[in-house]
């Protein structure tokens, strides 16, 4: 049986694209070994792998000197453990989806001379993917502008692998304006307290608009308003996307690409502490095309959001939806898998 090693975890931004590609490979008859960390989302979520191996890894970025040393040591020691596993199982290739948890599999694959492929989710690549790109056979990118950070001969624009239920619902979805204006607010996995508080305040003023707020982990005081529905987290995002006229969201890669797939006009508020400010650049290109609004956290207020919403509802959202959807890539997982399998056909 054909075998592949996959790594991508720590957070959902790395985990879910890896899961999407793994499901595709399973359908094609591959045996999958997943490499992750005991400290990440992968320790709580199922993954379509025949074997799931989790190691106690530590991050390096943003830590103290002692923390960095501990992080480097944990990644190097894990690299040698993964190397032994690779020599034992002899995979045909490995795929890494970024984040510090990918470094051991990437380095071990290089040392064991196993073909390595990586996928970069964000506009500005992570340090781990920058390092691993030197050893990779191909670098799959989500945004066209990311190619300049890698060897262009290696880069392939594939888009962002998304969950099946999102893709299946979005493919044939056509936006039609709601009778009652509806705004979906997505705080992202880390939440957005300031954004949530601004929306709650705004909902009490703009009573002709229905607000659906996914607030994340933050504790905020929620008044009893008929036009405001609040969730901490939801699994059925596809239902909420289809019910909205406008989306207000953080701009992590998964959220951005889901919004593109549903063709939603969005007001993006990038998470200001994202590495290299990548959330800002994930949507700057879309703003330059006039297909979204972009508000930096430092400029965020109830008044600014109110003005942005009023401007949004004065636009031809139906026409904009068609233009936005043109930038969606619905078969990202298949593009990645096809590119890899074609390499083996041509070798």
From Swiss-Prot:
Pathway: Cell wall biogenesis; peptidoglycan biosynthesis
Residues engaged in binding UDP-N-acetyl-alpha-D-glucosamine: 11-13, 122, 163, 189, 279
An example Gene Ontology biological process: carbohydrate metabolic process
Predominant cellular place of this UniProt entry's protein: membrane
Function: Cell wall formation. Catalyzes the transfer of a GlcNAc subunit on undecaprenyl-pyrophosphoryl-MurNAc-pentapeptide (lipid intermediate I) to form undecaprenyl-pyrophosphoryl-MurNAc-(pentapeptide)GlcNAc (lipid intermediate II).
Family stated for the protein in its record: Belongs to the glycosyltransferase 28 family. MurG subfamily.
Protein name, per record: UDP-N-acetylglucosamine--N-acetylmuramyl-(pentapeptide) pyrophosphoryl-undecaprenol N-acetylglucosamine transferase
Gene that this sequence comes from: murG
């Amino acid at each position: 049986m054909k075998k592949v090693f996959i790594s991508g975890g720590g957070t959902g931004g790395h985990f879910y694209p890896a899961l999407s590609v793994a499901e595709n490979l399973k359908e094609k008859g591959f045996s999958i070994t997943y490499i992750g960390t005991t400290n990440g989302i992968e320790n709580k979520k199922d993954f379509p792998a025949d074997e799931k191996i989790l190691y106690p890894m530590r991050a390096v970025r943003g830590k103290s000197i002692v923390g960095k040393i501990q992080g480097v040591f944990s990644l190097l020691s894990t690299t040698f453990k993964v190397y032994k596993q690779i020599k034992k199982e002899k995979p045909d290739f490995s795929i890494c989806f970024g984040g510090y948890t990918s470094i051991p599999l990437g380095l071990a694959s290089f040392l064991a001379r196993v073909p390595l492929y990586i996928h970069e989710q964000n506009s500005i690549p992570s340090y781990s993917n920058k390092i691993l790109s030197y050893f990779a056979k191909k670098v799959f990118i989500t945004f066209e502008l990311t190619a300049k950070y890698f060897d262009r001969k290696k880069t392939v624009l594939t888009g962002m692998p998304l969950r099946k239920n999102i893709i299946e619902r979005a493919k044939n979805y056509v936006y039609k304006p709601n009778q009652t204006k509806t705004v979906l607010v997505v705080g992202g996995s880390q939440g957005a307290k300031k954004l949530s508080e601004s929306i709650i305040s705004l909902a009490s003023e703009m009573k002709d608009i229905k607000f659906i707020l996914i607030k994340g982990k933050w504790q905020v005081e929620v008044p009893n308003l008929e036009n405001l529905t609040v969730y901490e987290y939801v699994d059925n995002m596809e239902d909420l996307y289809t019910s909205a006229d406008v989306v207000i969201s953080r701009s992590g890669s998964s959220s951005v690409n889901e919004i593109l797939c549903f063709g939603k006009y969005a007001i993006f508020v990038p998470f200001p502490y994202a590495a290299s400010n990548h959330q800002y650049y994930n949507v700057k290109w879309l703003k330059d095309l006039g297909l979204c609004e972009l508000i930096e956290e430092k400029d965020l207020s109830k008044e600014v959001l109110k003005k942005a919403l009023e401007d949004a509802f004065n636009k031809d959202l139906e026409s904009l939806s068609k233009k936005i959807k043109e930038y969606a890539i619905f078969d990202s997982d298949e593009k990645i898998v096809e590119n890899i399998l074609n390499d083996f056909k041509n070798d």
